[in-house]
Amino acid sequence: MSWKTEEVESHIPVMLKEFLKHCSPKRDEQWIDGTFGYGGHTTALLDKGCKVLALDTDEDAQKRAEILKEKGEEFYFFRKNFSEMAEACFQMGWTAVDGILLDLGVSLGQLKDPKRGFSFQFPDAPLDMRMDRTRERTGAALLNTLSKEQLVQLFSVACNMKESQKLANEIVRFRSTGPIKKVGDFLEIVTRARLLKSKINAATRPFLALRIAVNEELEHLEKALREGTKLLKGGGRIAVISFHSAEDRIVKEFMRSHCLPKKGEGVAEEENHREMFFYKVERVLVSLEERKNNPRSRSARLRIAWKIPLEEKSGL
């Protein structure tokens, strides 16, 4: 039986081939898909015979999951952030899992929906940017209420210090004449800030920084890495697909700092106190073919870490 729905068939999951090749999910394994979205990675796991517990905060993702749940009993969905995976596993009675996948960032559906305010392609849209619309804080609310110093800190996640200061100054100037409400208001602020020219649209990095702040994405990622690692069985793997340097830096540092050194390598003094969870870490870049067929994937990178088997860990 194929688990794919019509909507999943039309969606292209990022780095799916690489994920399946390097993680090798097997029949009857228990997997967590922390970012269900359109269900592309989940259905691939189900087609391999895995049991899948999926999470997503988006109500549209929940509707897609309900359709998938009608197909069988190997799929379970929770409308929660992936940082709450331990709680979801507890509710399911899952004490440990074979694998975890996190496909970070905003989905194509969220970007294309004008009401969500994620894209600068829709200037008349409300500046919302919430992945979970039950949350109160919108992008507009943050820009209207944060202090100048807090705004500089917000934008420094994706912009350099000079650009962050320019943006903060223009936001304070703009809101002195009236509240920021629409995507177009933020675009006007970016234009006034006269950021340094680059190959990408000048609004790309400011929009990214604001979205990260609205959804507390980096905080949730750090918690998910800690909690997820505890849930992994010995030999289990955690795979994270990231799209920008702030995310990737967190994933890289977490996996590297908790991985056994390679043969012949020593351990830095500051790392002696850290518990080692992993015996192997890999980085996989997106293929040229996928970059050509799916431009959204051009900045994607996949990092995978394998947990130390219990028998090996007991001998450390």
Swiss-Prot record:
GO function terms (MF aspect): rRNA (cytosine-N4-)-methyltransferase activity
One Gene Ontology CC term in the entry: cytoplasm
Cited InterPro entries: RsmH, SAM-dep_MeTrfase_MraW_recog, SAM-dependent_MTases_sf
Keyword Transferase part of the UniProt annotation: yes
EC assignment: 2.1.1.199
Gene Ontology biological process terms in this record: rRNA base methylation
Main location: cytoplasm
Amino-acid positions noted as binding S-adenosyl-L-methionine in the UniProt annotation, renumbered to this chain: G39, G40, H41, D56, F82, D103, Q110
Keyword annotations: Cytoplasm, Methyltransferase, rRNA processing, S-adenosyl-L-methionine, Transferase
Disulfide bonds: none
Intracellular or extracellular location(s): Cytoplasm
Catalytic activity line of the entry: cytidine(1402) in 16S rRNA + S-adenosyl-L-methionine = N(4)-methylcytidine(1402) in 16S rRNA + S-adenosyl-L-homocysteine + H(+)
One Pfam family cited in the UniProt record for this chain: Methyltransf_5
Superkingdom as given in the UniProt entry: Bacteria
HAMAP family: 16SrRNA_methyltr_H
Protein family: Belongs to the methyltransferase superfamily. RsmH family.
Its job: Specifically methylates the N4 position of cytidine in position 1402 (C1402) of 16S rRNA.
PANTHER family per record: 12S RRNA N4-METHYLCYTIDINE METHYLTRANSFERASE (PTHR11265:SF0), S-ADENOSYL-METHYLTRANSFERASE MRAW (PTHR11265)
Protein name: Ribosomal RNA small subunit methyltransferase H
Species: Methylacidiphilum infernorum (isolate V4)
